[in-house]
Amino acid sequence: MIATSLATWFGCGYAPKGPGTAGSVAALAIAWLLNTYAGVSSIGLGWLALLLAIPGIWAADVVARSSGVKDPQIVVVDEVVGQWMTLAGATTLNWKSWLLALALFRLFDIWKPPPVRQLERLPGGLGIVADDAMAGVYGALVLFAAGWFNLY
């Protein structure tokens, strides 16, 4: 029950269309709340992504093993890790950086440039989460560069 709740990010993974995007949008909503009401910075969101990755790997592994599917669509905790990792690259958090972070993470998560695709092949929950974490790193680098050049 706990593993399923965490893996599906409290039900977001059950979205009938685009559960990955639903997980990413939910991650942005929680990140916005953390930033606005708790003062969590973009770097803080990156640290939270790393902390979430540990139980996220476990939860993803439990759900994958119980379903018999290597990377079940309902598992979206990996999207949360990747989305928060992307936000770590923001030089400032404003509506433009939030939207750009969403677009960049989804781009790299779907495109899967090397080594994202290779990380996806790791066993169990590690492979489920690691590829999205790396997609998040790519997103963070591009988001940082865009901020550096005042593009948002």
Q: What kind of feature is each model-predicted range?
A:
Residues M1-V25, W58-T86, L107-V137:
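Interhelical loop and helix-boundary elements at the membrane-water interface
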Residues T4, S24, S41-A49, N94-A101, ...:
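Residue-level signature of transmembrane alpha-helical entry/exit and packing/kink sites
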Residues A15-L34, G44-L48, L52:
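Short Lys/Arg-rich amphipathic alpha-helical segments
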Residues A26-A38, M85-A90, L143:
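Interfacial segments of multi-pass membrane proteins
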Residues A31-W32, A49-W58, A101-I110, L143:
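Alpha-helical transmembrane segments of multi-pass membrane proteins
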Residues L34-W47, P115-G125:
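Membrane interface segments of multi-pass transport proteins and intramembrane proteases
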Residues G39-S66, K70-D71:
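Contiguous, small/hydrophobic- and glycine-enriched helical/loop subdomains that border
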Residues F144-Y152:
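Juxtamembrane boundary at the C-terminal end of a transmembrane helix
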